[in-house]
Amino acid sequence: MSRSPDKLALPPPPPPPPSRTVVVALSGSSKSKYVVTWAIEKFATEGNVGFKLLHIHPMITSVPTPMGNAIPISEVRDDVVTAYRQEILWQSEEMLKPYTKLFVRRKVAVEVLVIESDNVAAAIAEEVTRDSIDRIVIGGSSRSFFSRKADICSVISALMPNFCTVYVVSKGKLSCVRPSDSDGNATIREDGSERTNSSSGSSGPTSDSSDVMSSAHDSQSRPLSLPVRRMQHFPAIAGQASVPMETSSVGSDETRCMSLDAEEARDVSSINRSSTDTTSRWTPRRRDYEERKEAMSSSSSNREYGNFGTRFSWSGMGVDTTHSRASQQASNMSDALSEQSYTDNQVNLNFEVEKLRAELRHVQEMYAVAQTETFDASRKLGELNQRRLEEAIKLEELKLKEYEARELAEKEKQNFEKARRDAESMRERAEREIAQRREAERKSARDTKEKEKLEGTLGSPQLQYQHFAWEEIMAATSSFSEELKIGMGAYGAVYKCNLHHTTAVVKVLQSAENQLSKQFQQELEILSKIRHPHLVLLLGACPEQGALVYEYMENGSLEDRLFQVNNSPPLPWFERFRIAWEVAAALVFLHKSKPKPIIHRDLKPANILLDHNFVSKVGDVGLSTMVQVDPLSTKFTIYKQTSPVGTLCYIDPEYQRTGRISSKSDIYSFGMILLQLLTAKPAIALTHFVESAMDSNDEFLKILDQKAGNWPIEETRELAALALCCTELRGKDRPDLKDQILPALENLKKVAEKARNSFSGVSTQPPTHFICPLLKDVMNEPCVAADGYTYDRHAIEEWLKEHNTSPMTDSPLHSKNLLPNYTLYTAIMEWRSTR
C-alpha cells in the first residue's frame, strides 16, 4: 500500500558553498574598480564561484594627535589603541563598500578581509597559502618602456605558491598571467589575441617529475610577455647519475610581470618587426626542437621508472632498454636545451637593442625640441630689439613733454604767488572768525560732555525704572476690580489706578506662558532705557508678577478716535497730519537708537495713544525687537528667522514671506496707519481701495473721511501717495523714514499748524509733556531725574537742596544726578519757533 506524498512544501535548501574561491587584492585607488569589474566578468560566469576582497593596510605603530603629531602605541592606553584600530578598520571597510556592491548587483557571494601588515606581498602570499587559493587577481601598475625596476605585481607573483594562478589587470584589461604549475596549458589573452604555452612534460604517470619541476620553477623567473616554456626533469638513465635540466627563461625577476597593455603591445610589435631577420634564422631550429620534444613527450608517457633506477620498461611491451639508448636520449635532450638556450639569449639581445634604439629616438626628439627653443629665443631677441627702439622714441617724446611741463609749472608758480597773497588776507579774516567761535566751542564742549554722560547712562545694562511692590499695585487697582479694567491687550488686561498720587495704567501679563515672560522682559528692557515725547512713558514695574505701570492717556487710542468709539468726536484733518508726523518721529528715534536699533513690529492705530491734548504716543512695545546692525549695509537690514508676529493687515508681506525683519517692516505698518488717518476705514483691502481712487479727484474726495473737515486737496493727495509708497510689497521699494518720509511730513505739519491756529483763533497751547511738574510752565532746560520724570533743571535742583524724595512719587531717590533730555529740548524749541 503506497502513501501519498506529503503536501507540505519543504523550505528551499540553502545555497551550496562556493566550490572555488577567487581572491581580488585591492589597494583602494581609483583603478581598483577596473580590477573588480574584470574579475566579475571573468569568473562570475563559471558557476558556483565565491570571491574574497583582500586589502592590506600598514601596521599601526603610532596614534595621531589633534596637533598633527604621532605618539607610539607603547605610550598610549590600550583602550585608545583599540579605538584607533577600530577606526582604521571601519575606514577600510567603508572604502571597500563600493566594490562589494558590484558583487551584490551580480548576485555573487563575496567576503571582505582586511589584514594589517607592512609587507603587502608577503601578507597576500600567506593568506593564499593558508586558504589554498588557486586563483588571485591583482592590479598592475603603469610602467614606462624604459622601466627596469620590479613593481609590486612582480613581487607578489614571485611570492605566490606554485598552485596559485596570478592574474594581473591593468586599465581594465588582462596585462599578464603567471600560471600555476598544475596547469597543463596557460593561455594569455592580450586585446583579443591568444598565446598558448604548453609544458614539455605530460600528465599521468609523470606526476613525480612534475613536482620536482615545480620546485625548480619556484626559483626561476617566468617572463609573461613572451611564451612560457617549461621543461620537466627526466630521471637518470645509468647508475646514480642524473641529467640536470634547467628551464630557460627570458629576462629576470624584475621583468617577470612585464605589462602588456595597449601601448607596450605596440612597442613589442615594433621590436618584432625590426628583428624579422634574426627570427628567421632560429625559427627552423625551434620547429625541429619542438618536433623532437613532442616525440620525447609521447614516448615518455609510456615509461615507468623508479626513484633512482637505472633502467625502465615500455608499458605493454616489457622490453628493457639498454644503457646506450638512455645515453643517446640524454645527449639529444642536451643538444635541444643548448639550442633553446642560444635562441632565447638571441631574443634577449635583440630586445635590448630595440630598447637602445628607442632611447636614441628619444634623444633625437629632445634635440629637435632644443632646436625649436633656440629658434624661439632668437625671434624673441629680435622683438626685444624692436621694442627697445620704440621705447627710445617714447623717451624722446617724454623729454619734450617734460620741457613743456616746466614752462607750465613756471606759469603756475606765478599764479601761486598771487593766490598766496590772497590767502594771507583770508587768513587774517579767519583769525577774527576764530576769536568769535572760541566761546561757541567752549559751550559745545560742555554740551558734548553732558551728552556723552547721558548716552553712557542710557546704554547701561541696568534697568532704570521705579520698582513697585505687588501689594501697592493690588491696593491701587482694588485687587484688579472689573470696574477699573479699561481694556484687554493681547497678553493681558489693562487697569486704571492711582499710584503715589499719580493716575497711571497697570498692565498685568499672563505669566503662565514662557512667551509672555519673554515679552515682558523685552518691554521692560526697552522702555526702561528710552525716553521720547512720543513714546508712552514707563513709570515703573513689578517684575516678580509681570506688571508694568504706564502713564495714563486720557483720550484713549487713535483707533477709538478714528472709528468714534463711545461717540467720541472725530479728529480734524490738521490733527491727523500732526499725529502722522509725531508717529514718524517716534519711529525714527527707535530705528536710530544706539547701540542697537529697535523694531516695533506691531505698529497699528490701537497702539497709538492720545493724551488730553491729543498728543500721540506710541505704546505696546511688547513685540519690539532690539537687533544688530548689518555692518555691510548703509541702511541696516536685520535678519531674524522667526514666525510672523504682529497684527493682520499691518504685517509686512515680505516679513510674512521670508521671516526677515527690518525697519522697512515698520514703514509698511506706518503706511497703513496713514491710509486710515485719511479714510477712517478698516485696513482690509484699503491699499487697493485708495489706489483705485487716486486717478480722479472726485473719487479721491469720496474716500476721505468727511467728518475731518475740508481736506486741502493738494497736501492730502501728497500724503496719500506717500502712504501708498510705504505699503509697497517689496521693502527696497519703500521710502526711507528719516530722509524721505519725515521731511515730507514736516512740511504737511506746518500746513496743519497754520490751519489749526486759524481754526481756533488763539495761540497754540503747549503740550502737557512740555510742562514742568514743579513750575507748571514750559521747561527751559528739561532734565531726567532718578525717578524717571522730566523736570526743569533749575526747579529740580532747588527741590533736591531740601528733599531726598521724588516730587512725583514721594519715594526716596537713589541718586541726585540729572540727565539732560535733548530730545524734549529740541521739541520745545521747535514748538516755540512756530508760535
Swiss-Prot record:
Molecular function as annotated in GO: ATP binding; protein serine kinase activity; protein serine/threonine kinase activity; ubiquitin-protein transferase activity
Name of the featured protein: U-box domain-containing protein 35
Pathway this chain belongs to: Protein modification; protein ubiquitination
Function (record text): Functions as an E3 ubiquitin ligase.
All residue ranges annotated as the U-box domain in the record: 765-835
Coiled coil (UniProt feature): 340-459
Positions annotated to bind ATP: I486, G487, M488, G489, A490, Y491, G492, A493, V494, K507
Biological process according to GO: protein ubiquitination
Keywords: ATP-binding, Coiled coil, Kinase, Nucleotide-binding, Serine/threonine-protein kinase, Transferase, Ubl conjugation pathway
SMART domains in the cross-refs: S_TKc, Ubox
Entries under PROSITE patterns matching the protein: PROTEIN_KINASE_ATP, PROTEIN_KINASE_DOM, PROTEIN_KINASE_ST, U_BOX
InterPro entries found in the cross-reference section: Kinase-like_dom_sf (IPR011009), Prot_kinase_dom (IPR000719), Protein_kinase_ATP_BS (IPR017441), Rossmann-like_a/b/a_fold (IPR014729), Ser-Thr/Tyr_kinase_cat_dom (IPR001245), Ser/Thr_kinase_AS (IPR008271), U-box_ubiquitin_ligases (IPR051348), Ubox_domain (IPR003613)
Biased composition (Polar residues): 269-282
Family: Belongs to the protein kinase superfamily. Ser/Thr protein kinase family.
Chain intervals with Low complexity compositional bias: 195-218
CDD domains on file: RING-Ubox_WDSUB1-like, USP_STK_Ubox_N
Sequence ranges assigned to domain Protein kinase in this UniProt record: 480-745
EC id: 2.3.2.27, 2.7.11.-
Top-level division of the source organism's lineage: Eukaryota
Region of interest (Disordered), ranges: 1-22, 177-303, 410-457
Active site: D602
Reactions that this protein is recorded to catalyse: L-seryl-[protein] + ATP = O-phospho-L-seryl-[protein] + ADP + H(+); L-threonyl-[protein] + ATP = O-phospho-L-threonyl-[protein] + ADP + H(+); S-ubiquitinyl-[E2 ubiquitin-conjugating enzyme]-L-cysteine + [acceptor protein]-L-lysine = [E2 ubiquitin-conjugating enzyme]-L-cysteine + N(6)-ubiquitinyl-[acceptor protein]-L-lysine
Biased composition (Pro residues): 10-19
